[in-house]
Amino acid sequence: MWENKFEKESLTFDDVLLLPAESDVLPKEVDLSVQLSEGIKLNIPVISAGMDTVTESKMAISMARQGGLGVIHKNMNIEDQADEVQKVKRSENGVISNPFFLTPEESVFEAEALMGKYRISGVPIVNNKEDRQFVGIITNRDLRFIEDFSIKISDVMTKEQLVTAPVGTTLDEAEKLLQQHKIEKLPLVKEGRLEGLITIKDIEKVLEFPNSAKDEHGRLLVGAAIGIAKDTDIRAQKLVEAGVDALVIDTAHGHSKGVLEQVKHIKETFPQVTLIAGNVATAEGTKALYEAGADVVKVGIGPGSICTTRVVAGVGVPQITAVYDCATEARKHGKAIIADGGIKFSGDIIKALAAGGHAVMLGSLLAGTEESPGATEVFQGRQYKVYRGMGSLGAMESGSNDRYFQEDKAPKKFVPEGIEGRIAYKGSLQDTIYQLMGGVRSGMGYTGSRNLEALREEAQFTRMGPAGLAESHPHDVQITKESPNYSF
């Protein structure tokens, strides 16, 4: 040990480039899908970080529609986080197998509150919650001129000429019925009992977002962060009940006893849910998490733009080497890793994937988009969005202190491992993802990689020094117009 103390030399994104290779692959032909776990297939290898200025339901919905995955952060109470998951799961469906419903005796106020909370335009009405015989429907059109919201639903709901379809109706058949009768919602019934629902909005979304990442029921995929705090069991239970597809045990040091015990416990309690755990930066840490029960391991200690772990704690591994070392171990287990942090350009994404990552987790590249929950502010005439690390003082005060094993400390005693800042406003997530994936596709064309597995297995790197990095960026010219995929 002593003799080898300084033996390890590590590399990061700016130290390497991918070698171009003979190629018969065009960028538009590459396959960006990845089977992250048995239950999760993504159509792009991108996951939005579980940070309180990056991912809530709005970001997670948009990420899944683009083919990726959003991880809802945990800096909120358990009920609110479960609600955020439900918003994603109910945002669109092929067929809604467990639709919301109300009874005629409930008030119009309850119908209005339910529609407002989940942004839906109507609710089926059943005779009672046990028999669930379909008797009517109430929509936002029925509520437009109502002044007294305490009246019963039965006074305003549509009861006559109800259009229904049997269970098993396909989306194509449903679309014809919806158009024929000029309605937006088609209840699915079996012997009069409400069993499902198909809406015109869901059909339109299927056509608008054909690349969406969905579960077996046609609902958008979503993940949620949990930690190792005392309420973790209850939080995980509520998230699973809400329909979460992946639980993410999110800590600064995944190769620690408490985290490994939590991974083992959560996997034993919820074996059907994909378990992502981290963060680690060594093969040994990766092995320990897999053996504890993790399905996917998250790699990265200190590379993030808002992370100060490496300068505060003096610990970490430059990200390309960390990804490669952890991926080498992952291959032995036949499992996936996620490269989390340090990515500044689309070129860094393909480097992380070529080094062994199955997907990347992004924070700063997405924090400036319209869909992020960070506050918008104007500075020197330009729009920005607030972006902070989960190890920053503000985030720790809001609930992420257990991530850094400081849950028992008073706020004045916190030792932050992150900063708070701002990032330029970028517009829609869809445009950002388009540019990022365009860069990845271009890179795979250069390396001759038809899919991500070929990229991982066959792509080769060359090392470069500071002069090579300087040569890689625009030089000897003054940039006069911003590019949508480059700023330095």
From Swiss-Prot:
Q: Which GO terms describe its biological process?
A: GMP biosynthetic process; GTP biosynthetic process
One function term, GO molecular function aspect: IMP dehydrogenase activity
Per UniProt, activity regulation is:
Mycophenolic acid (MPA) is a non-competitive inhibitor that prevents formation of the closed enzyme conformation by binding to the same site as the amobile flap. In contrast, mizoribine monophosphate (MZP) is a competitive inhibitor that induces the closed conformation. MPA is a potent inhibitor of mammalian IMPDHs but a poor inhibitor of the bacterial enzymes. MZP is a more potent inhibitor of bacterial IMPDH.
Query: What Enzyme Commission number does this protein have?
Result: 1.1.1.205
Residues the record marks as active site: C307 (thioimidate intermediate), R403 (proton acceptor)
InterPro entries reported for this sequence: Aldolase_TIM, CBS_dom, CBS_dom_sf, IMP_DH, IMP_DH/GMP_Rdtase_CS, IMP_DH_GMPRt
Keyword field = CBS domain, GMP biosynthesis, Metal-binding, NAD, Oxidoreductase, Potassium, Purine biosynthesis, Repeat
Q: Where does IMP bind?
A: S305, D340, G341, G342, G363, S364, Y387, R388, G389, M390, G391, E417
Location of the region described as Disordered in the Swiss-Prot/TrEMBL record? 467-488
For activity, the cofactor(s) needed are: K(+)
Q: Which Pfam families match?
A: CBS, IMPDH
The UniProt record gives the binding positions of NAD(+) as D250, G300, I301, G302
Which sites bind K(+)?
Answer: G302, G304, C307, E471, S472, H473
Catalytic activity reads: IMP + NAD(+) + H2O = XMP + NADH + H(+)
At the top level of its lineage, which domain of life is listed?
Bacteria
Give every CBS domain span: 95-153, 157-216
Q: In which pathway does it act?
A: Purine metabolism; XMP biosynthesis via de novo pathway; XMP from IMP: step 1/1
**What Gene3D superfamilies does its record include?**
Aldolase class I
Family per similarity comment: Belongs to the IMPDH/GMPR family.
Role this protein plays: Catalyzes the conversion of inosine 5'-phosphate (IMP) to xanthosine 5'-phosphate (XMP), the first committed and rate-limiting step in the de novo synthesis of guanine nucleotides, and therefore plays an important role in the regulation of cell growth.
NCBIfam families (UniProt xref): IMP_dehydrog
Q: How does it assemble?
A: Homotetramer.
Protein name in the entry: Inosine-5'-monophosphate dehydrogenase
Question: What is the name of the gene encoding this protein?
Answer: guaB
